[in-house]
Amino acid sequence: MDKQTIINKIQKLIRLRDGARAVGSEGEANAAAAAIQRLITEYNMSLSEIEGTPEAEEESCIGRSNNYHTADNYRSGWKRHLLYAICEYYYCKAYMLSGTPRCVVYGTEMNRMAVEYAFNFLEAAFTHLSVIRFKEAHGTCRIPTRHRDVWLASYLLGCSSGIREKLMSEKTEQVTGLMISHGAMIDKYMAQEQGS
């Protein structure tokens, strides 16, 4: 496919995603967003190429996100593992703030937005599912709180590990090259930030 055909296809998917969100079809919006991400990654494109606007060029610069609270009630570190996996998939880097349960994310504006959306969505979904799965597994049995917490921590850690495996299995050699490029830009930004 030539570049313009790919750009047209991505623009149609963006309109589909926005339309699905407007009518409240979260599943269709997520499917369209995943297809957009896959095409952008596969063909090594940037948002500025798709939108063709100077504003999009400005969005591609590296920046730092707000703090992500990664502490969890079970001290298993599942939120941190989830954030790291999502960051790696979206060409960002996450770092723990010393002495706190918080992380910051470095990357392009669009990638950081994707990380924030995916992290918030998956964190809420996994937390909700963990309670449902616990009730399915144990029914009406009385389980000590400590055992329940261990079970939930194990389930949530398994969810974050499963997401990591799924995201990493979708990578190709082209994606690896793009990751190295973004990694170098992030390292350069961090060096400049520390130097000033």
Walk through the language-model features, giving the residues of each:
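Extended, helix-rich structural scaffolds rather than catalytic motifs
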Residues: 1-8, 45-196
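Non-transmembrane amphipathic alpha-helical segments
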Residues: 6, 10-20, 39, 129
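Short amphipathic alpha-helical coiled-coil/interface segments
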Residues: 10, 29-43, 155-160
